[in-house]
């Protein structure tokens, strides 16, 4: 693919995926406003969030397939208008059904673009600057998640939320305009012999996503005492096991489970999942604590939320500078230890803590999470033979998003149930519930450190960037081979990626 400049591709990547990430976290922050405006209950107001997450996870594996068939430019120019339509539906919605439809369109468009843009982004950087891709992945993608939280806080403060989705739609419209001029057609596989579509895998994935969504809806409505909830989760578990078995055995799977069954991809998946859940739990508890317990003003809460961007910037810069020097394992250890410290401080926070203390904890939370996400993301991507990189990473992203799909609902459900079990005043009950959330986040942080130590024990793995003359100093280049039938010793022997091999590997799905 021809590009004008790698920073243009970076901009296109952020405009393709960022608005969807912003929309998800912003909508979670303005649930109270949505309930007042649309006239819905707490139960139904979270359904659009769940449906959007479901569509996001479900459509991730479709991105590489659509790119292979049609090319990146047509898919880009088709997906972003779908996202714009979804944003307009939400912004103009008068009932929860339209909001759910809008979130489905947003999630589907973002899911399709995720695994199209990540390989394109990494491929666009020259070999000696490839570590800059982490600057965009963490600063742009993870930063979009944080910006969504900040915008949601601002919307809550001013009492209006619809303008958020006009902004998200406008960002996607800018992406369409930029892609029209700078994203060119590429060679794709339409003329080649097409491999048979994995219909069984696609159907099982759809059924799995639907069963998961229904189960979480039942949980929100009836709680764990209902038999329907347990039946739903039982069906979901059976479908998940069936999907893993089918995708492991099929020749051309929709989700390449077999290719990610290596130490680094598995550990990377667990690290990303634990890291994203940790920050979701911590932010939810801390913002609720500040609003309800400390009676902090909305202006101060917005300023505190803005400090999260400082942590994102720190994480992006450190990830880009340190990944090739220390490897994903050590990067994850550093981030995990920061999160352990932050959650330990929140467990023992004093009633008279200053705003400066809160700001420092916010910065450290964002920085620690960013480092762990970088470690898990790149550790999983680079943790196996290169020809299977995109397929392996697609499987990791699908499973990560599937695990995260119901987290917002679980956080809300746990907080309300935990507070209801407590005796005493409402304020004391909520304080105990938030304290329990901090404890859960602390346990997850400790788990992150342990997983990162395991990642570090597997070795540094591939480097992202190196000088062109470095490849002459390395061992003779091995032929690009698939992970199937590859010994562990051979997999670990890859250290520096030859530029030609790297680019051919990332283009593997387009041929």
From Swiss-Prot:
Annotated Gene Ontology cellular component terms: plasma membrane
Subcellular location: Cell membrane
Region (Disordered): 465-486
Alphabetical UniProt keywords: Cell membrane, Membrane, Transmembrane, Transmembrane helix, Transport
GO molecular function ontology, one term from the record: transmembrane transporter activity
Biological-process GO terms, alphabetical: transmembrane transport
Pfam families associated with the record: MFS_1
Lineage: superkingdom: Bacteria
Record-linked InterPro entries: MFS, MFS_dom, MFS_trans_sf
Family: Belongs to the major facilitator superfamily.
The protein's name in its UniProt record: Uncharacterized MFS-type transporter YubD
Gene behind this protein: yubD
């Amino acid at each position: 693919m021809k590009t004008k400049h790698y920073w243009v591709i970076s901009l296109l990547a952020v405009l393709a995926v960022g608005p969807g990430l912003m929309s998800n976290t912003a909508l979670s922050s303005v649930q109270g406003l949505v309930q007042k405006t649309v006239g819905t209950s707490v139960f139904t107001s979270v359904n659009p969030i769940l449906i959007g997450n479901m569509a996001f996870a479900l459509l991730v594996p479709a991105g590489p397939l659509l790119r292979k068939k049609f090319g990146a430019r047509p898919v880009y120019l088709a997906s972003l208008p779908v996202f714009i339509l979804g944003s307009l539906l939400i912004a103009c919605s008068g009932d929860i059904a339209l909001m759910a439809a809008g979130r489905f369109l947003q999630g589907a468009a973002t899911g399709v673009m995720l695994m199209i843009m990540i390989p394109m982004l990494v491929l666009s950087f020259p070999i000696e600057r490839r570590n800059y891709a982490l600057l965009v992945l963490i600063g742009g993608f993870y930063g979009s998640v944080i910006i969504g939280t900040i915008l949601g806080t601002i919307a809550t403060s001013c009492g209006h939320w619809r303008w958020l989705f006009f902004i998200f739609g406008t960002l996607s419209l800018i992406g369409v305009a930029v892609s029209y001029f700078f994203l060119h057609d590429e060679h794709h596989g339409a003329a080649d012999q097409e491999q048979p579509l994995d219909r069984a895998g696609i159907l099982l994935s759809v059924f799995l996503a639907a069963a998961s969504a229904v189960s979480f809806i039942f949980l929100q409505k009836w709680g764990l005492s209902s038999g329907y909830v347990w039946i739903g989760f039982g069906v979901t578990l059976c479908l998940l096991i069936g999907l893993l078995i089918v995708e492991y055995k099929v020749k051309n799977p929709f989700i390449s489970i077999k290719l990610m069954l290596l130490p680094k991809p598995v550990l990377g998946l667990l690290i990303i999942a634990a890291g994203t859940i940790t920050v979701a739990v911590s932010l939810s508890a801390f913002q609720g604590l500040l609003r309800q317990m400390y009676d902090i003003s909305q202006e101060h809460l917005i300023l505190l939320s803005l400090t999260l961007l400082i942590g994102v910037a720190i994480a992006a810069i450190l990830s880009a500078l340190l990944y090739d020097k220390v490897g994903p394992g050590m990067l994850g250890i550093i981030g995990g230890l920061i999160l352990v410290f932050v959650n330990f401080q929140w467990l023992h926070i004093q009633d008279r803590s200053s705003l400066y203390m809160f700001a420092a904890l916010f910065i450290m939370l964002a920085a620690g999470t960013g480092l762990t996400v970088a470690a898990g993301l790149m550790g999983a991507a680079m943790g196996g033979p290169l020809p299977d990189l995109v397929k392996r990473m697609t499987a990791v992203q699908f499973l990560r998003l599937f695990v995260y799909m119901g987290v917002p609902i679980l956080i809300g459900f746990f907080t309300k149930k935990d507070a209801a079990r407590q005796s005493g005043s409402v304020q004391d009950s909520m304080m105990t519930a938030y304290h329990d959330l901090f404890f859960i986040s602390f346990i997850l942080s400790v788990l992150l450190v342990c997983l990162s130590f395991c990642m570090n024990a597997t070795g540094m793995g591939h480097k992202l960037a190196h000088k062109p003359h470095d490849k002459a100093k390395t061992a003779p280049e091995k032929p690009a081979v698939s992970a199937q039938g590859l010994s562990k010793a051979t997999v670990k022997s890859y250290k520096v990626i030859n530029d030609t091999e790297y680019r051919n590997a990332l283009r593997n799905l387009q041929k």
